Protein backbone atom coordinates (compact mmCIF):
# COMPACT_ATOMS: atom_id res chain seq x y z
CA UNK A 1 0.00 0.00 0.00
CA UNK A 2 1.39 3.38 -0.97
CA UNK A 3 0.53 6.71 0.63
CA UNK A 4 -0.48 8.28 -2.68
CA UNK A 5 -2.17 6.65 -5.66
CA UNK A 6 0.06 6.72 -8.71
CA UNK A 7 3.58 8.11 -8.48
CA UNK A 8 5.13 8.61 -5.01
CA UNK A 9 8.28 10.74 -5.11
CA UNK A 10 10.72 10.38 -2.18
CA UNK A 11 12.45 13.74 -1.73
CA UNK A 12 14.27 12.93 1.52
CA UNK A 13 14.94 9.50 3.02
CA UNK A 14 15.16 8.05 6.52
CA UNK A 15 18.47 8.89 8.22
CA UNK A 16 20.46 9.14 5.00
CA UNK A 17 23.93 10.72 5.09
CA UNK A 18 22.62 14.17 4.16
CA UNK A 19 20.13 14.18 7.09
CA UNK A 20 21.06 11.55 9.69
CA UNK A 21 18.56 12.99 12.21
CA UNK A 22 15.60 12.67 9.81
CA UNK A 23 13.30 10.08 11.41
CA UNK A 24 10.97 9.68 8.46
CA UNK A 25 10.71 9.99 4.72
CA UNK A 26 9.34 12.92 2.76
CA UNK A 27 6.97 12.04 -0.07
CA UNK A 28 5.25 13.99 -2.81
CA UNK A 29 2.21 12.63 -4.60
CA UNK A 30 2.85 13.48 -8.24
CA UNK A 31 -0.51 12.20 -9.52
CA UNK A 32 -2.71 12.35 -6.43
CA UNK A 33 -2.50 14.63 -3.38
CA UNK A 34 -4.74 12.53 -1.10
CA UNK A 35 -2.83 10.89 1.77
CA UNK A 36 -3.92 7.29 2.48
CA UNK A 37 -3.26 5.12 5.54
CA UNK A 38 -0.79 2.31 4.88
CA UNK A 39 -2.00 0.25 7.85
CA UNK A 40 -5.18 -0.23 9.82
CA UNK A 41 -5.69 0.92 13.39
CA UNK A 42 -7.22 3.70 15.46
CA UNK A 43 -6.66 7.40 14.92
CA UNK A 44 -4.75 8.51 18.02
CA UNK A 45 -4.47 12.15 16.95
CA UNK A 46 -5.74 14.30 14.09
CA UNK A 47 -5.02 18.01 14.23
CA UNK A 48 -2.27 20.50 14.90
CA UNK A 49 -0.12 21.25 17.95
CA UNK A 50 0.79 24.91 18.46
CA UNK A 51 4.43 25.91 18.90
CA UNK A 52 3.56 27.50 22.25
CA UNK A 53 2.37 24.11 23.56
CA UNK A 54 5.97 22.90 23.57
CA UNK A 55 7.34 19.71 22.14
CA UNK A 56 8.52 19.15 18.61
CA UNK A 57 5.29 17.99 17.00
CA UNK A 58 4.40 21.62 16.18
CA UNK A 59 6.90 21.21 13.34
CA UNK A 60 4.58 18.66 11.71
CA UNK A 61 1.75 21.16 11.21
CA UNK A 62 -1.52 19.32 10.70
CA UNK A 63 -0.91 15.63 11.16
CA UNK A 64 -2.61 12.30 11.75
CA UNK A 65 -1.26 9.57 14.01
CA UNK A 66 -2.59 6.06 13.49
CA UNK A 67 -2.10 3.67 16.40
CA UNK A 68 -1.67 0.58 14.28
CA UNK A 69 -3.20 -2.81 14.92
CA UNK A 70 0.40 -4.11 14.85
CA UNK A 71 1.48 -1.95 17.82
CA UNK A 72 3.32 0.62 15.69
CA UNK A 73 2.45 4.30 15.37
CA UNK A 74 2.16 5.82 11.89
CA UNK A 75 2.55 9.59 11.46
CA UNK A 76 1.38 11.51 8.36
CA UNK A 77 2.54 15.13 8.67
CA UNK A 78 2.32 18.58 6.99
CA UNK A 79 -1.24 17.92 5.82
CA UNK A 80 -3.14 20.84 4.31
CA UNK A 81 -5.21 22.97 6.69
CA UNK A 82 -8.88 22.00 6.57
CA UNK A 83 -8.19 18.73 4.74
CA UNK A 84 -8.34 16.18 7.58
CA UNK A 85 -10.88 13.44 6.85
CA UNK A 86 -10.54 11.48 10.11
CA UNK A 87 -10.91 12.22 13.82
CA UNK A 88 -9.35 10.85 17.01
CA UNK A 89 -10.86 7.54 18.06
CA UNK A 90 -11.95 6.58 14.55
CA UNK A 91 -11.03 3.11 13.26
CA UNK A 92 -9.34 3.10 9.85
CA UNK A 93 -8.13 0.49 7.39
CA UNK A 94 -5.19 0.53 5.01
CA UNK A 95 -6.27 2.76 2.14
CA UNK A 96 -8.46 5.11 4.20
CA UNK A 97 -8.12 8.73 3.02
CA UNK A 98 -6.65 10.79 5.88
CA UNK A 99 -6.25 14.25 4.35
CA UNK A 100 -4.40 16.14 1.64
CA UNK A 101 -0.68 16.67 1.19
CA UNK A 102 0.21 20.16 2.39
CA UNK A 103 2.83 22.62 3.56
CA UNK A 104 1.90 23.26 7.21
CA UNK A 105 4.32 23.40 10.14
CA UNK A 106 8.07 23.58 9.57
CA UNK A 107 8.01 22.78 5.86
CA UNK A 108 9.56 24.21 2.72
CA UNK A 109 7.13 22.94 0.10
CA UNK A 110 4.10 20.70 -0.18
CA UNK A 111 4.89 17.11 0.83
CA UNK A 112 4.00 14.51 3.44
CA UNK A 113 6.51 13.58 6.13
CA UNK A 114 5.83 9.92 7.02
CA UNK A 115 7.19 8.32 10.17
CA UNK A 116 6.77 4.92 11.82
CA UNK A 117 7.62 4.24 15.47
CA UNK A 118 7.67 0.91 17.29
CA UNK A 119 5.93 0.20 20.61
CA UNK A 120 8.91 1.75 22.46
CA UNK A 121 8.70 5.01 20.50
CA UNK A 122 11.82 4.34 18.45
CA UNK A 123 11.70 5.55 14.85
CA UNK A 124 12.11 2.75 12.31
CA UNK A 125 12.69 2.94 8.56
CA UNK A 126 9.22 3.69 7.14
CA UNK A 127 10.05 3.16 3.47
CA UNK A 128 8.83 -0.44 3.25
CA UNK A 129 5.55 0.46 4.95
CA UNK A 130 5.00 3.15 2.31
CA UNK A 131 5.83 0.80 -0.57
CA UNK A 132 8.99 2.68 -1.59
CA UNK A 133 12.74 2.34 -1.13
CA UNK A 134 14.71 4.47 1.33
CA UNK A 135 16.24 6.40 -1.55
CA UNK A 136 15.37 9.58 -3.38
CA UNK A 137 13.38 8.65 -6.46
CA UNK A 138 9.92 8.09 -7.88
CA UNK A 139 8.00 4.89 -7.20
CA UNK A 140 4.71 3.73 -8.69
CA UNK A 141 1.93 1.67 -7.18
CA UNK A 142 1.76 -1.37 -9.44
CA UNK A 143 -1.38 -2.81 -7.81
CA UNK A 144 -3.47 -0.97 -10.39
CA UNK A 145 -1.42 -2.36 -13.26
CA UNK A 146 -2.24 -5.40 -15.40
CA UNK A 147 -3.33 -8.37 -13.27
CA UNK A 148 -0.85 -10.46 -15.25
CA UNK A 149 2.09 -8.48 -13.83
CA UNK A 150 4.06 -10.47 -11.28
CA UNK A 151 6.72 -8.04 -10.03
CA UNK A 152 9.09 -5.27 -10.98
CA UNK A 153 12.84 -5.56 -10.91
CA UNK A 154 14.88 -2.37 -10.90
CA UNK A 155 18.61 -2.56 -11.55
CA UNK A 156 20.83 0.44 -12.22
CA UNK A 157 17.93 2.54 -13.41
CA UNK A 158 16.76 -0.16 -15.83
CA UNK A 159 13.27 -1.42 -15.15
CA UNK A 160 12.13 -4.83 -16.32
CA UNK A 161 8.53 -6.01 -16.04
CA UNK A 162 8.01 -9.73 -15.60
CA UNK A 163 4.54 -11.09 -16.31
CA UNK A 164 3.08 -14.29 -14.91
CA UNK A 165 3.85 -16.22 -18.16
CA UNK A 166 7.48 -15.04 -17.93
CA UNK A 167 7.77 -16.25 -14.36
CA UNK A 168 6.01 -19.54 -15.11
CA UNK A 169 8.37 -20.18 -18.03
CA UNK A 170 11.37 -19.64 -15.76
CA UNK A 171 9.86 -21.80 -13.01
CA UNK A 172 9.15 -24.60 -15.50
CA UNK A 173 12.72 -24.70 -16.78
CA UNK A 174 14.61 -23.92 -13.58
CA UNK A 175 16.88 -26.78 -12.55
CA UNK A 176 19.30 -26.37 -9.66
CA UNK A 177 20.32 -22.84 -10.56
CA UNK A 178 20.51 -23.50 -14.30
CA UNK A 179 17.86 -22.80 -16.86
CA UNK A 180 17.06 -25.61 -19.29
CA UNK A 181 15.82 -25.23 -22.87
Which residues does each predicted region cover?
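Zn2+-dependent peptidoglycan hydrolase active-site motif and core
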Residues: 20-23, 38-88, 110-115
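Acidic/polar residues in short coil/turn loops that connect beta-strands
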Residues: 70-71, 120, 156-158
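Residue-level preference for non-acidic, small/hydrophobic
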Residues: 10, 41, 95-98
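Boundary/junction segments of secreted and surface-exposed precursor proteins
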Residues: 2-6, 154
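Residue-level recognition of short, solvent-exposed, well-ordered loop/turn junctions
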Residues: 30, 36, 87-93
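Short, surface-exposed polybasic-aromatic patches that bind anionic ligands, especially phosphate groups
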Residues: 144-181
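Conserved, short, structured surface segments that act as functional micro-motifs
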Residues: 55-67, 90-143
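Short glycine/threonine/proline-enriched tight-turn/helix- or strand-capping micro-motif at secondary-structure
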Residues: 9-39, 48
